[in-house]
Amino acid sequence: MKSIVIVAGGTGGHISPGVALAEVLTELKEKIGYENLYLYSLVRNKNNPDLEQAPCPVLWHNLPPLSSNFFLFPIRYTIQIIKTFFIFKKLNIDVVIGMGGYSTVSSILYGIFFRKKIYLCEQNTIPGNVNRLFFRFASKVAFSLPPKNSKIPCDYQVLGNPLRKKTIPKMSLKFFEKYDTKKKKQFNVLVMGGSQGARQINNIVIALMSHEEINKQFRFRVLTGSALYEEVSKKSKKDAELISYSDNMKEHYEWANFVIARSGSGVLSECAAFALPMILIPYPYAKDDHQMANAKYFELNGAAIVVDQKDEDESHLFRVLDQMANDVNLLNDMSISSLECSHVDASKDTAKYFFSLD
C-alpha cells in the first residue's frame, strides 16, 4: 500500500470526522503499512480550524459548487476531475476514503477508474445522494447512525461518528449531575446551530430570554455562528452570553446541563459523548429531511426531545423547557440515554474496520 487520501470537503460536518479519522490513521501507520496520508478539501475551507490543525498534509481542490453558471459548470467540473486524477496518480493514491458530499465525486471517480480501494463514511440515517450513488463501488461503508433503509448494496457497519481527540471527554462515563430542586439552581443551556449557525434557533432563544420566568431557571450560552454574531448581538440583551465561534467545544459541553441544537450528526455525536440531554430543532429544509431522521433516532432512544417547526415562535420551546425544569428525573434519564447512544471510539473503530485490523 502506498498512499491514503481522506476526502473531506463541504461543511464542518464532513471535515471534522475526516480530520478525526486522520488522527487515528496517523497513529496506526505501521499497522496499516501505508507510506503517506493526505486530506483533500475545498479551497474555501483553508481557514477551517480543524484543517489548520490537521495531523497530515492537506491538498486543496476547487470543485465548482452545484449552483455555478449552468453553461460553464460542466467544463469547470470536468477540468477539476482531470486535475484530481493527475494529482492522485502522482501521489500513488491507493485508498480513497470519502466523508460524503458532492466534493468527494472527483476523488471517488478516480478510485473507480483506476480500481483503487474506496471506503465511505456516512454521517446520517438517510444517506446523501453522492454516497448513495457510489455505495456499490465501495469496499466498505461506515455509518455514524443506523441507516433508515437497511438495504445497503455493500458491506457496512454502524460505528458512530469519528470525534476529534480534543473533543472527547477525559472520562468515558459522565452522568448528568443529580439536581436538588430545593436549591433552585439555574440550568446551563448550550445553544448551537451547527458549523454555520442557525438564524431560526438564535431568534427563538432571544425571544425566550425576554421571559422573566425563563431567565430565572436557565442560563443560556449561544454559539451564534460567525456570520450571524453581529445580527444576534443587536437583538439580544446586554447580559446574554454570545460566542461567534469556538474551537474548544469541550469547554462548552462540560459547562452545559443540556443542549438546544440542530441535528447534524457531528453535534449529536459530540453531545452524546458528554451525556448531554438534547432539545433538537432539525433544519426543516435539509435534503431528504435527514436532520429530522437523525433527531428521531435520538428521541426514540430517550436522549432527545424534538421540536419540529419552521417558524420562530418560541412558545413550543418554552413549554419543553418548562417541562425539563420541573422534571429532574427526565433530565437524568435523558442523560443516561444520551451516553448510551455515544461512540467515543468511533475513529479507531472505523479505521480498524476499513483496514481489517484486530
UniProtKB/Swiss-Prot annotation:
Sequence similarity: Belongs to the glycosyltransferase 28 family. MurG subfamily.
Membrane topology type: Peripheral membrane protein
Function noted in UniProt: Cell wall formation. Catalyzes the transfer of a GlcNAc subunit on undecaprenyl-pyrophosphoryl-MurNAc-pentapeptide (lipid intermediate I) to form undecaprenyl-pyrophosphoryl-MurNAc-(pentapeptide)GlcNAc (lipid intermediate II).
Taxonomic classification: Bacteria, Pseudomonadati, Spirochaetota, Spirochaetia, Leptospirales
Binding site for UDP-N-acetyl-alpha-D-glucosamine: 11-13, 124, 164, 195, 291
EC number(s) stated in the UniProt entry for this protein: 2.4.1.227
Protein name stated in the entry: UDP-N-acetylglucosamine--N-acetylmuramyl-(pentapeptide) pyrophosphoryl-undecaprenol N-acetylglucosamine transferase
Entries under InterPro entries matching the protein: GlcNAc_MurG, Glyco_trans_28_C, GlycoTrans_28_N
EC primary class: transferase
Cellular location(s): Cell inner membrane
